[in-house]
Amino acid sequence: VLVDSEILVAKAFAKYMQNFGVDIDEKEFASFAGKKTVQVIDILSKKYSIKDQERFFTNIMDIASNIYKKELTTVKGAYDFVSNSKLNMFIGSNSMKERIIDGLQRVKLDKYFKPEQVYSFDLVDNPKPDPDVYLKDLEDNNLIKTETIIIEDSAVGVMAGVAANVKVIGLTAGGHWHEKRDEKELLEAGAFAVTNDYKKIFKLIESN
């Protein structure tokens, strides 16, 4: 929800899959939103009979890294939200910690998040939609669930937050939320509200 990486990962997969004569549309990528890269690779490998998943992963990471260097930006409104916030903030992600920190550095958000404020799937047993990453964050920092709100941009993430018994705001400001995607996806996953504007997040937090 901070760095606009999902759309860039989609570009990396689209580029790589062309090697197999496969064109993947936005609708198919939307179904992967919030999933770990290795999970997406497993799904595509089985669907399109790609045997070498290790090579698949290495190539995708190389392509994605090159795209990141040139195109990675913050989600619209994210920088202002973070820089103006006096809230106690943490990150809970299905990405790897090293990758998250690198992304924060690239978009100049690293000064707002210390490494210990970043929680990633490699720190827990199960990735989202299981609640492990959020439960670890809550426990490590003695956070009170009723005083905590999670902001998520995927159904997988929303389900993880709800499973952790925390209120979730759905955010559709990222580039992967193309016009054909319906915010109902996040509401049905359990978000109590959905917005496409970071400026509205503070009001939603205050009202809850």
Where are these regions (language model features)?
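Asp-based, Mg2+/Mn2+-dependent phosphohydrolase catalytic module
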Residues: M96-N208
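Conserved phosphoryl-transfer catalytic core
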Residues: V9-S31
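Metal-dependent phosphoesterase signature
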Residues: D23, I43-D80
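Short helix-capping segments at alpha-helix termini
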Residues: N19-V22, Y48-K51, K108-Y112, N142-L143
